[in-house]
Amino acid sequence: MKMIMNIRQRLNKNYNELNGLYHEISMKLGLSDSKSMVMYMLYDIQEPLTQSDIVKATGLSKQTLNSAIRKLEKEGIIILEKLNEKSKKIVMTDKGQVLIEQKMKPLVDMEDRVLASWTEEDRRKYLELIEKFKVQFEKEVKAYDKRK
Protein backbone atom coordinates (compact mmCIF):
# COMPACT_ATOMS: atom_id res chain seq x y z
CA MET A 1 0.00 0.00 0.00
CA LYS A 2 2.94 2.33 0.67
CA MET A 3 4.10 1.83 -2.92
CA ILE A 4 0.63 2.79 -4.23
CA MET A 5 0.66 5.89 -2.01
CA ASN A 6 4.06 6.92 -3.40
CA ILE A 7 2.86 6.43 -6.98
CA ARG A 8 -0.31 8.43 -6.27
CA GLN A 9 1.76 11.22 -4.69
CA ARG A 10 4.12 11.32 -7.68
CA LEU A 11 1.17 11.30 -10.06
CA ASN A 12 -0.48 14.20 -8.21
CA LYS A 13 2.79 16.12 -7.96
CA ASN A 14 3.34 15.82 -11.71
CA TYR A 15 -0.28 16.67 -12.48
CA ASN A 16 -0.12 19.78 -10.28
CA GLU A 17 3.24 20.86 -11.71
CA LEU A 18 1.92 20.39 -15.24
CA ASN A 19 -1.10 22.56 -14.38
CA GLY A 20 1.37 25.12 -13.02
CA LEU A 21 3.23 25.10 -16.34
CA TYR A 22 -0.01 25.65 -18.26
CA HIS A 23 -0.79 28.54 -15.89
CA GLU A 24 2.70 29.96 -16.50
CA ILE A 25 2.36 29.86 -20.28
CA SER A 26 -1.15 31.35 -20.06
CA MET A 27 0.29 34.28 -18.09
CA LYS A 28 3.12 34.67 -20.63
CA LEU A 29 0.49 34.77 -23.38
CA GLY A 30 -1.41 37.45 -21.44
CA LEU A 31 -4.40 35.24 -20.69
CA SER A 32 -6.26 34.04 -17.64
CA ASP A 33 -6.36 30.28 -17.22
CA SER A 34 -10.06 30.14 -18.12
CA LYS A 35 -9.72 32.29 -21.26
CA SER A 36 -6.72 30.20 -22.25
CA MET A 37 -8.72 26.96 -21.86
CA VAL A 38 -11.59 28.28 -24.00
CA MET A 39 -9.24 29.59 -26.70
CA TYR A 40 -7.21 26.36 -26.63
CA MET A 41 -10.31 24.21 -27.15
CA LEU A 42 -11.55 26.40 -30.01
CA TYR A 43 -8.11 26.26 -31.62
CA ASP A 44 -7.60 22.53 -31.09
CA ILE A 45 -11.05 21.33 -32.11
CA GLN A 46 -11.55 23.90 -34.91
CA GLU A 47 -15.33 23.91 -34.66
CA PRO A 48 -17.95 25.73 -32.60
CA LEU A 49 -18.51 24.40 -29.09
CA THR A 50 -21.18 24.86 -26.47
CA GLN A 51 -20.49 25.97 -22.93
CA SER A 52 -21.46 22.51 -21.69
CA ASP A 53 -18.87 20.97 -24.06
CA ILE A 54 -16.18 23.11 -22.44
CA VAL A 55 -17.37 22.54 -18.86
CA LYS A 56 -17.36 18.78 -19.46
CA ALA A 57 -13.89 18.79 -21.05
CA THR A 58 -12.15 21.19 -18.66
CA GLY A 59 -13.87 20.91 -15.31
CA LEU A 60 -14.26 24.70 -15.18
CA SER A 61 -17.26 25.84 -13.18
CA LYS A 62 -20.16 27.24 -15.18
CA GLN A 63 -19.65 30.64 -13.51
CA THR A 64 -15.93 30.79 -14.34
CA LEU A 65 -16.55 29.70 -17.91
CA ASN A 66 -19.41 32.17 -18.34
CA SER A 67 -17.17 34.98 -17.10
CA ALA A 68 -14.39 34.02 -19.54
CA ILE A 69 -16.87 33.79 -22.41
CA ARG A 70 -18.35 37.20 -21.62
CA LYS A 71 -14.85 38.72 -21.66
CA LEU A 72 -13.94 37.02 -24.95
CA GLU A 73 -17.24 38.15 -26.42
CA LYS A 74 -16.70 41.74 -25.24
CA GLU A 75 -13.21 41.69 -26.81
CA GLY A 76 -14.72 40.58 -30.14
CA ILE A 77 -12.92 37.23 -30.10
CA ILE A 78 -16.06 35.08 -30.08
CA ILE A 79 -19.76 35.40 -30.69
CA LEU A 80 -22.53 33.26 -29.29
CA GLU A 81 -25.01 31.84 -31.77
CA LYS A 82 -28.26 30.24 -30.70
CA LEU A 83 -28.14 26.48 -31.20
CA ASN A 84 -31.47 25.60 -29.61
CA GLU A 85 -33.66 26.79 -26.73
CA LYS A 86 -31.09 25.85 -24.10
CA SER A 87 -27.72 26.17 -25.83
CA LYS A 88 -25.59 28.61 -27.73
CA LYS A 89 -22.54 27.69 -29.71
CA ILE A 90 -19.30 29.59 -29.26
CA VAL A 91 -17.97 30.72 -32.61
CA MET A 92 -14.67 32.47 -33.32
CA THR A 93 -14.91 35.80 -35.10
CA ASP A 94 -12.41 36.63 -37.84
CA LYS A 95 -10.53 38.72 -35.28
CA GLY A 96 -10.78 35.80 -32.85
CA GLN A 97 -9.36 33.32 -35.35
CA VAL A 98 -6.30 35.51 -35.87
CA LEU A 99 -5.79 36.12 -32.13
CA ILE A 100 -6.43 32.51 -31.14
CA GLU A 101 -3.95 31.36 -33.79
CA GLN A 102 -1.34 33.83 -32.45
CA LYS A 103 -1.87 32.82 -28.82
CA MET A 104 -2.52 29.08 -29.05
CA LYS A 105 -0.22 27.95 -31.86
CA PRO A 106 2.93 28.50 -29.74
CA LEU A 107 1.42 26.42 -26.92
CA VAL A 108 0.30 23.61 -29.24
CA ASP A 109 3.70 23.68 -30.94
CA MET A 110 5.37 23.20 -27.53
CA GLU A 111 3.15 20.19 -26.79
CA ASP A 112 3.80 18.77 -30.26
CA ARG A 113 7.58 19.12 -29.84
CA VAL A 114 7.44 17.26 -26.53
CA LEU A 115 5.35 14.45 -28.01
CA ALA A 116 7.53 14.29 -31.14
CA SER A 117 10.59 13.80 -28.92
CA TRP A 118 9.08 10.58 -27.53
CA THR A 119 9.14 7.25 -29.28
CA GLU A 120 5.95 6.01 -30.90
CA GLU A 121 5.83 3.33 -28.19
CA ASP A 122 6.09 5.93 -25.39
CA ARG A 123 3.28 8.02 -26.92
CA ARG A 124 1.07 4.95 -27.30
CA LYS A 125 1.81 3.74 -23.76
CA TYR A 126 1.24 7.18 -22.23
CA LEU A 127 -2.15 7.56 -23.91
CA GLU A 128 -3.15 4.01 -23.08
CA LEU A 129 -2.33 4.43 -19.38
CA ILE A 130 -3.82 7.89 -18.93
CA GLU A 131 -7.02 6.77 -20.65
CA LYS A 132 -7.13 3.63 -18.50
CA PHE A 133 -6.66 5.72 -15.33
CA LYS A 134 -9.42 8.13 -16.40
CA VAL A 135 -11.90 5.34 -17.16
CA GLN A 136 -11.23 3.53 -13.88
CA PHE A 137 -11.29 6.74 -11.85
CA GLU A 138 -14.58 7.71 -13.50
CA LYS A 139 -16.02 4.36 -12.35
CA GLU A 140 -14.80 5.07 -8.81
CA VAL A 141 -16.44 8.50 -8.83
CA LYS A 142 -19.74 7.06 -10.06
CA ALA A 143 -19.59 4.25 -7.50
CA TYR A 144 -19.06 6.84 -4.77
CA ASP A 145 -22.28 8.59 -5.82
CA LYS A 146 -24.16 5.31 -5.34
CA ARG A 147 -22.76 4.81 -1.82
CA LYS A 148 -24.19 8.08 -0.55
For every predicted segment, state its role.
Residues 11, 39-42, 130:
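Hydrophobic structural patches
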Residues 20-64:
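N-terminal helix-turn-helix DNA-binding core of bacterial DNA-binding proteins
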Residues 70-128:
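Charged, amphipathic alpha-helical coiled-coil/dimerization segments
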